[in-house]
């Protein structure tokens, strides 16, 4: 909770990193109001707000980045996976407040700048227009409605945004079910 974050925060806190929709261990989106309150707390305390969009970013949720649907403006956004259609590529975006620390030569890797991956990333970004993102939201709504229409007592809530959806399956399960 926001209260527990405030209670545990010491004077040496400089940033908060959050994954808006937990992708591993169950697909669990955070509440929009909680995320907005956390962003406000970060501004109040002068903490950086870092958003991990490795799984949620690049159109999967129906917007280029999920944070856009939460009504916040992070200081740093990390992204990967979807940016190059499965090829190894990732990156970060920063606001002006943080951009100055990334001077030439301070951010790099011995495995980075693969020309095939960067070409794939460019192709993905060229595809990522508003009609494409609208289709992601429409298809997500269609899937959600179809799953809910099944009406099975074993199927619980359908959660997520866009095409990043999860289904709560109720009842005990074995590896044969």
Language model regions located:
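Conserved N-terminal phosphate-binding loop of PLP-dependent enzymes in the Aspartate aminotransferase
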Residues: 1-177
């Amino acid at each position: 909770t926001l209260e527990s974050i405030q209670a545990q925060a010491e004077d040496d806190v400089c940033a908060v990193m959050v994954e808006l929709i937990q992708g591993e261990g169950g697909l669990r989106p955070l509440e929009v109001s909680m995320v907005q309150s956390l962003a406000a707390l970060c501004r109040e305390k002068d903490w950086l707000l870092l958003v991990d969009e490795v799984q949620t970013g690049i159109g999967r949720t129906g917007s280029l980045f999920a944070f856009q649907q939460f009504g916040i403006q992070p200081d740093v956004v990390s992204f990967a996976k979807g940016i190059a259609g499965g090829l190894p590529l990732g990156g970060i975006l920063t606001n002006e407040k943080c951009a100055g620390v990334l001077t030439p030569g301070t951010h790099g890797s011995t495995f980075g700048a693969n020309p095939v991956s960067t070409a794939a990333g460019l192709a993905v970004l060229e595809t990522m227009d508003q009609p494409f993102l609208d289709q992601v939201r429409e298809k997500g709504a269609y899937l959600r409605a179809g799953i809910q229409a099944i009406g099975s007592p074993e199927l619980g809530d359908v959660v997520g945004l866009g095409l990043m959806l999860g289904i709560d399956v109720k009842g005990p399960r074995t590896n044969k079910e």
